[in-house]
Amino acid sequence: MANIKSAKKRIKVIETKTLRNKMIKSALKTKIKNFEVAVANNDLNEAKSAYTIVVKALDMAAAKGILHKNKAARKKSRLATKLSGLNA
């Protein structure tokens, strides 16, 4: 346990940020799952709208530093491949 006042504050700040990051990651996983369900059901319109939502969420997570920008780009690429497979 920290004894210094600033260290105690940093612990509180880290806990707050960790909670926020977990919430954002959880919401992101839910959005990705919704997209994959739409793709599995061969619902093109639903998949397109879900894809735009997922891409926006991935970009925001990358901008906030929750995900690395390359990981976000990789996920977007793989989801786009699934979407294009649905178009064909």
From Swiss-Prot:
Q: Which UniProt keywords apply?
A: Ribonucleoprotein, Ribosomal protein, RNA-binding, rRNA-binding
Question: Which Pfam families does this one have?
Answer: Ribosomal_S20p (PF01649)
Q: Per the UniProt entry, what are the Gene Ontology biological process annotations, in alphabetical order?
A: translation
Which GO cellular component terms are attached? cytosol; small ribosomal subunit
PANTHER family of this UniProt entry?
30S RIBOSOMAL PROTEIN S20, SMALL RIBOSOMAL SUBUNIT PROTEIN BS20C
Sequence similarity: Belongs to the bacterial ribosomal protein bS20 family.
Q: According to its UniProt entry, what is the function of this protein?
A: Binds directly to 16S ribosomal RNA.
Protein name (database record) = Small ribosomal subunit protein bS20
Q: Which organism is it from?
A: Clostridium novyi (strain NT)
Gene for this chain: rpsT
